[in-house]
Amino acid sequence: MPPKKTETKAADASAAAAPAPAAAPTSAPKTKSPSTHASYLDMITDAIVALKDRAGSSRQALKKYVRANNTLGNVTDNMFDSLFNKALKNGVDKGVFEQPKGPSGGTKLAKKVAKPAPKKAAPKKETKEKKPAAAKKEGAAKKETKEKKAPAAKKAAAPKKAAAPKKEVKEKKAAAPKKKAAAPAVADKETVLTKTKSGRVAKSTAKPAAAKKAAAPKKAAASKKAEKAEPAAEKA
């Protein structure tokens, strides 16, 4: 029995040393061959332009043109019909194609409606340029007001020239008393005491020098009368 155990161990070791079976080779990814034709939408558009049917080209006529003028490769009839119908429907939905009589009628290109040109907004730079112009106008107005104020100040200063004659008037008024003082002073009239016949003393104002000269003889006569009157008084 013990020899059997050794045999089993040797068999296990040989099995472990044996190389593992090689994995199956993976298949290379399938690459799609590039299409040698345009999209179905473009091919249908070219067919409509080439056929030039005013009422619209039929579906069968379009299919024949697409097959005859494009290399579609290994495409089955069923695949071609599904791709063609799908492209035609998408073109109608997008507004590229037009079917006036419905899906069973002819197909033609939709008329392009000219879109109105968007209105251009007024440039904002013009408003920015106008503001400095307004500021300049305000500055010019301020300068004009300043210039106007300056002549007003000059006009206010003008009365100073008119004030000069007042000094001359004052000087003339002050000079007026001098003229009065320069006038010859009136001499006080001299009073002369004379005695009347009754013996009373009478006061009389003296006349000017010329008058005094004329009155001189009268004084002599008066003195004679006084001398005569004194002896008479002594006798009495």
Swiss-Prot record:
Belongs to the histone H1/H5 family. InterPro entries: H1/H5 (IPR005819), Histone_H1/H5_H15 (IPR005818), WH-like_DNA-bd_sf (IPR036388), WH_DNA-bd_sf (IPR036390). Residues 11-36, 153-162, 202-220 have a biased composition (Low complexity). Residues 1-10, 123-150, 165-174, 224-236 have a biased composition (Basic and acidic residues). The keyword Oxidoreductase does not apply. Pfam families: Linker_histone. Residues 36-111 form the H15 domain. This is Histone H1. One of its GO terms (cellular component) is nucleosome. Residues 1-36, 94-236 are annotated as: Disordered. It comes from Neurospora crassa (strain ATCC 24698 / 74-OR23-1A / CBS 708.71 / DSM 1257 / FGSC 987). Its main location: nucleus. Keywords: Chromosome, DNA-binding, Nucleus.
